[in-house]
């Protein structure tokens, strides 16, 4: 039919002819619009996921608040007070006038010294604690800390040795959550065993213990220390590189560690039976000095940025996999809608947009079911149960919609392949982009091959 005949036709007939002529383009546009609309239920599922994550985080917080939170161990640090002469300017009233005068006064300051050598050896015994359906990893850690301080020197501050208050020296250790300490804490320093009491003596850190030390003097060459502690915590353990040279060894039966922080282990062994890790760190990788005065507070951000240690990851974080799978939801919808559209093109079957909508909603419900099932079962089991239910629903519906059991069987096989393809992508975290791209090229090649002989203009004009 040429353009002259179209122009001579009545308006109503003309509209029908145009709709018929561009029916394929219109159908493709409707499918594209429907795909975009299905992003709405997918976003709603994503919103439900965020809500469940918030509930999980709240449950984990309740567990850790009673057992022990993520622990960071910093110290010990030696604190020695001293007296010095300080000149300041102060406003004084003289003869009813305010004058600014120089005042010389004796003030008290504290000097902080970090150890020259710091060693830590520990073992973490992990287990899972539940709050309802939610679980978090907690551990009981046995740590042995040792090392030595160099002889404290006040020369850089020009302090008179006679003004150093050696008899008021203190030793301080920062432990993030002291609720995790399961027994009394003691430290052996300079040959004497002292008990540690709660009190935060270090700036820029949270929580800590300290003790008064007697017997220190300016004639000591080196001050050794050693202590053992049993510490409850959850999910992670960190150390601060407080020594000039730091040597830390950790072992555990947890099979899925994640080594985090400013320094990675110099050596590690990870297997299904657990892990062993060994750090050798110098003080060059941190931003705070080896000694300072209390009028130069340590930067808390700088301290945290140089910490190192290990996270005890859950063996399988189902929420993480569900979140990744939802990101592929639009791909799943496009692939299945492409298959339905090809059935329309290659056969006389016509599929109504409402039927496309029902199939799309079924695909979206798969992700909601996956989220619900993954909270009570492993992700793999939840995925394939959800995939089986979704495939069964869509297949039975397709048999009627496509008016053929054979075509419904093709849809079933296609869905199984698509779900298997997405599952492989989810499991292959490092190579998911490569495998996913290769799969899309394969799908595009199949579509191009199947439609290679279609004369689209002739089909619309038929």
Q: What are the language-model segments listed below?
A:
Residues 1-20:
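N-terminal Lys/Arg-rich, disordered targeting/topogenic segments
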Residues 20-47:
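Hydrophobic alpha-helical transmembrane signal-anchor segments
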Residues 23, 302-333, 352-353:
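Cytosolic-side membrane-insertion boundary helix
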Residues 42-46, 315-326, 424, 428:
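Glycine- and acidic
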Residues 44-70:
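Alpha-helical transmembrane signal-anchor/signal-peptide segments
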Residues 54, 58, 65, 79, ...:
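Soluble non-transmembrane domains of integral membrane proteins
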Residues 61-89:
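Short extracytoplasmic
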Residues 330-462:
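Generic detector of multi-pass transmembrane helix bundles and their immediately adjacent loops
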């Amino acid at each position: 039919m040429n353009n002259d005949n179209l122009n001579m036709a009545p308006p109503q007939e003309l509209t029908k002819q145009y709709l018929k002529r561009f029916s394929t383009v219109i159908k493709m546009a409707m499918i594209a619009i429907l795909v975009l609309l299905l992003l709405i239920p997918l976003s709603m599922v994503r919103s439900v996921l965020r809500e469940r994550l918030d509930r999980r985080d709240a449950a984990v917080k309740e567990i850790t608040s009673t057992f022990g939170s993520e622990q960071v161990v910093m110290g010990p640090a030696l604190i020695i007070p001293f007296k010095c002469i300080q000149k300041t300017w102060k406003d004084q009233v003289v003869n009813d006038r305010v004058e600014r005068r120089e005042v010389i006064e004796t003030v008290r300051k504290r000097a902080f010294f970090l150890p020259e050598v710091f060693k830590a050896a520990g073992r973490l015994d992990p287990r899972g604690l539940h709050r309802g359906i939610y679980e978090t990893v907690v551990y009981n850690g046995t740590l042995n800390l040792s090392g030595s301080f160099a002889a404290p020197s006040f020369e850089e501050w020009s302090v008179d040795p006679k003004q150093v208050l050696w008899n008021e020296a203190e030793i301080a250790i920062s432990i993030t959550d002291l609720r995790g300490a399961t027994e009394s804490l003691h430290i052996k320093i300079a040959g004497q065993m002292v008990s540690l009491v709660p009190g935060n003596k270090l700036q820029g850190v949270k929580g800590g213990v300290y003790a008064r030390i007697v017997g220190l003097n300016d004639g000591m060459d080196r001050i050794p220390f050693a202590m053992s502690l049993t510490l409850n915590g959850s999910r992670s353990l960190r150390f601060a590189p407080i020594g000039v040279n730091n040597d830390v060894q950790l072992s555990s039966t947890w099979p899925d560690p994640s080594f985090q922080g400013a320094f990675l282990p110099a050596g590690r062994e990870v297997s299904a039976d657990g892990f062993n890790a060994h750090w050798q760190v110098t003080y060059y990788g941190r931003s705070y000095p080896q000694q300072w005065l209390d009028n130069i507070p340590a930067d808390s951000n700088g301290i945290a940025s140089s910490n190192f240690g290990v996270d005890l990851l859950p063996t399988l974080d189902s929420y993480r996999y569900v979140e990744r799978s939802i990101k592929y939801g639009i791909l799943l919808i496009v692939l299945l809608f492409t298959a339905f559209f090809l059935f329309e093109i290659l056969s006389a079957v016509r599929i109504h947009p409402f039927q496309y909508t029902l199939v799309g909603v079924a695909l979206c419900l798969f992700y909601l079911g996956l989220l619900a099932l993954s909270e009570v079962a492993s992700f793999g089991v939840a995925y394939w149960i959800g995939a089986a239910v979704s495939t069964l629903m869509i297949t039975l519906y397709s048999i009627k919609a496509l008016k053929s059991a054979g075509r419904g069987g093709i849809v079933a096989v296609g869905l199984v392949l698509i779900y298997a393809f997405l599952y492989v992508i989810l499991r292959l975290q490092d190579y998911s982009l490569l495998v996913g791209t290769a799969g899309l090229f394969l799908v595009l090649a199949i579509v191009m091959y199947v439609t290679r002989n279609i004369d689209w203009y002739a089909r619309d004009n038929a």
